[in-house]
Structures are given as structure tokens and as C-alpha cells.
Amino acid sequence: MRTTFQFTDGWKFHRGDLDETNYRAIHANRFKRAEWMKAGNHGISRVGYPDETWHDVDLPHDFVVASDYTPTANAVHGSLPTDVAWYRKTFELPAEIRHQRIHLEFDGIYRDATIWVNGHLAGSHLSGYTSFSLDVTELCDPNECNAIAVRCDAQEFELWSYEGGGIYRDVRLVATDDLHVPYSGTCIRSTFPDEADLSKVQIELQAQIHNAGREDRAAQVTFKIFADTGASPVYESSQAAPIAAGTSTAINHRLDLSQPTLWSIASPHLYRLETHVQVADKSCDIYHSHFGVRSIRFDADQGCFLNGESIKLKGVCNHQDHAGVGVAILPTIDEWRLKQLKAMGCNAIRTAHNPPAPHLLDLCDRMGFLVMNETRLSGTSPEFLGQLQALITRDRNHPSVCLWSLGNEEMLIQENAMGAKMLQRMQDLTHRLDPTRPCIYSANCDFNNIAENFVNNGFQIDTFGANY
């Protein structure tokens, strides 16, 4: 069964890079850095590494905000110097999860992060804003103490505003059965066959089921839909799902729901989906997802309609930093900020200019805000398309999300053929991952030339964004 542990307490922190990464490493007498020479050779991430002089910290943690202001640091980044930093943590696996698969989920590290466990490379992640998960099962010792080390390099900027540095969002350790729903593994789509009749909605459910074991499994997948706080399901359905060893299978189900309670700004009602995976009488996984039922559309002449009613979007560009804590934002801070915005008449948020913390979207779902969810950079490299895909697959179940933003003021490409083709490919990918929401691109400068360039190169953006 799935068990989730908050992995935020008891970390060690060192500011600055380390010239030597050896500790009881092979070839340590000949090289200062031998982590790429032998498996398990990364000393900083091994148990026993001397970190007594490192600082004790809890996550989320922004190490840049603790710096002294200096005129030599970049002013638009707060006149605070950035750096490379290291984090370390030792941990033991509780007895009840020692024979399960072990995953580490990171909501955000700024930036260019490399993660090591017990001397072994676990993974790397370039973006300072997208979330990711690592399966570290084989790297963990089920019976002994384990160690993790994270190196991040905040010296490169992604924005022209304060970005901080470090493991500045939540981290979780998640234990699962070999047979489980992977990270961001469900997709829930609500469509109305008749936009004029909101009493009947068609819901499409998809769950990815991954079998990390060495044997084929004859699974049973059950979808249960609840009102958010309800104890009894309003809908339930089961189906057989044979999953071959070492593979993932998408389980799809479609249902009609009558008289749904709609999600709206004034009444943000949520539903809860439980995806149950079992084999014979053994429960292998229960994966929780929240979603809302609502219709939203944009009309060039009449504007935005939510659940068939015309609304005005009264929004703000929401940069994630806050006084005193930098980018290490707790949900309580974002909740306070949203309450102030709600009192001012605000009903929409733009995640300027990057993927947000997951908790911000949870709050917008529950507090009744619409969200323009923005990827960090326009591009068609595997890295930038991967960032866009990670954003959409993580966030597409949130009813608050109403627009996918493909970029912001990309002055070098927005008026030429290359840019139109790049944005077209990004929009095509977005439509495949989520055909229920429109895309937007936030243009600046000469809107007429930009629009003409799009049309001349065969690109039709779903919603045209004009900044200034």
C-alpha cells in the first residue's frame, strides 16, 4: 500500500561548492572527485560523511534570501549573491516499507540539481520550477541508515526577478507496491455534450498503472468518485487490468454523471477520485486525485464564459517570492495572500512566469480562483517540451486552471517564422495532453505584427494574449 512521508525535517546545508567529493571512495588517494569512476563512489551522499560543520535546516529552504545585500549582485534579483549549495539528509526506512518501492518527490529545486543516494547518482533536474519524482528503490538499504545529497546551482537565472535558490519547495518520500499509479498518473476530463445543458456531464478517467516487478500481474482497477468530503462514492466502477512485468498500462473509463455540483468562483465544489489497484484480495495502491466539474470557454467577441455565464477575469501576475522568506513559501503564506486578493475583488492568477508550487493550485481550487498556468520558456528542445509536459500532466486535473500559457514576451521569436513554428509545436503537444483547455501566448510590443506573423506561418493561437 502507498505510504507518504514528509521529507522536510532534519537536513544539513552547506553553501558553496565542494572541491572534493570523496569519502571512503575507490581511487580517493589519486583523485579529489571520483564519483564517475565507480558505482557508489560519491562520498558526500554516503553514510558517515563528516557534515558536523554544516548548518541544520528544514525545508522549504531558500539559502539566497539569507545573504547580505551587495551592490555587486544583480539588482533585479534582489541584490543578493547566488551560489552553489549542497544539502544532505540521513534516514532509515520504517519496517513497514522496507520491501516496497521507494520514491522521492521534489516539488521544486532552484536549480540545476543533481541527486545522489548512498553514493549513487539518482537523477538530475535542470529546471528550477518543475516538479519531479525519482525511483530510488535499488539505491536504498532497507535495514541500515541511508543518506541523500542534493547539489544545486542557483548561479544561472531563469527570470529577470528574484528567484532564490535551494530546495525551496516540499519533498516527500513515497513508498508503493511494485504495482502502483506513478507520479501524476491520473487524468480526469469533464465535457458537456450540450453546452446549454449543464445537468449532464461526461467524465473521462485515465490511470496509468505501472508494474515495476518481475512478474506479470492480473490487476483489478476500481475508480471511485466522491463528493470532496463525502464518505460514500457517488460513482464506482471496476475493470480487469493485466499489467506485464516492467511495463505501464493506461486504464481508461468513461461515465455520465447527472446533476453534477459545478465548480465556480463563488462555489468551488470539488470531487475526489480514488483509484484502487488490487490483485486478488490484496490491495496494492490507492491513489487520490481531486477535480472539479465546470465548463469554460473564450469567445473573441463576447469574452470568457464559466458554466455558461459571462465573467470578467480580474487577475494579477503572481510571482512566488514573499518578504522575509524569499521563495520558500509555505501554504499558509499563499493562503493569506489569496485572501487579500479575494478581498480586493481579484478572481484570477497568472503564475508569472513559471510553473507554480502544487499547493498554490490546491488553494486556488478550494478558494475559487481561475489560473493562467505558465511554462517557463518557449522552446522545442526535449528539455523545454519536457518541462511543458511535466507542467500539464501534473496540473491538468485542477479545475482552477483555465489556460496554458506557452510563453511570455519572447521578443526574439514572436515576430518570425521560427517562433511561430515553435509555438505551434508547443500548442500541438498541449492539445494532445489536454484537449479541454485553450493555450495562450503573452505577447508584447507590436501586437499586429505578431498576429500577422502567426497567420502568415499557419499558426493560430487559441487565445491571443496582449501584455503591453
Predicted regions and their residues:
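N-terminal carbohydrate-binding accessory modules
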Residues: G185-T186, E274-A343, D362
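Substrate-binding/catalytic cleft of secreted carbohydrate-active enzymes
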Residues: L338-A343, A348-Y468
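Beta-strand-rich binding/interaction modules
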Residues: V117, S199-A241, T249-H253
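Short glycine/proline/serine/threonine-rich loop/turn segments at secondary-structure transition edges
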Residues: I97-R101, C140-C145, D216, L257-R272
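Accessory carbohydrate-binding/adhesion or oligomerization-edge regions at the termini
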Residues: M1-Y69, A147-D153, D228-G230
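Accessory beta-strand-rich segments of carbohydrate-active enzymes
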Residues: T3-F5, K12-L18, D62-A66, V76-S190, ...
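Short, solvent-exposed loop/linker segments at the N-terminal edge
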Residues: S190-V201
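Exposed aromatic-hydrophobic patches
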Residues: S131-E138, S248-D256
